[in-house]
A protein has these predicted regions:
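Acidic, aromatic-enriched beta-alpha/helix-loop junctions
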Residues: 11-14, 27-69
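Broad, structure-driven detector of short, well-ordered beta-strand segments within folded domains
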Residues: 22-27, 74-76
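A sequence-level detector of short linear motifs
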Residues: 22-23, 35, 84-85
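Negatively charged, low-complexity tracts enriched in Asp/Glu with abundant Ser/Thr
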Residues: 1-12
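Short, compact, well-ordered microdomains
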Residues: 58-92
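Glycine-centered positions within short beta-strands or beta-hairpins
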Residues: 18-19
Length: 92
């Protein structure tokens, strides 16, 4: 799957345990968020970041992130912060 500059991938808790990622959302070119339950991911291709960090990189993502959290509990509330998963390519 190709990632574009504003893509965000969000996964289940399994990534924190170093296991394979089983649930991924991503932003497609037409602006629709899609869910791929059968897509395989490698943990090394993704990066755990604080939500405030990703919002600081692209403030337009704030509304999208908040809507996604209402749809499904795809975020981590960990260590008193909210976290999401993004591709390494987004932060390079």
């Amino acid at each position: 799957m190709q990632y574009y500059p504003n893509d965000v991938a969000i996964t289940t808790q399994s990534v924190l345990d170093g296991m394979s990622i089983t649930h991924v959302y991503y932003h497609s070119t037409d602006g629709i968020w899609e869910f791929f339950p059968d897509q395989e991911w490698v943990v090394n291709d993704l990066r755990l970041v604080a939500m405030k960090e990703i919002v600081s990189k692209d403030p337009r993502l704030l509304d999208v992130i908040l809507k996604m959290s209402e749809r499904e509990a795809a975020f981590y509330d960990y260590d008193e912060h909210r976290w999401v998963i993004i591709p390494y390519s987004y932060t390079d």
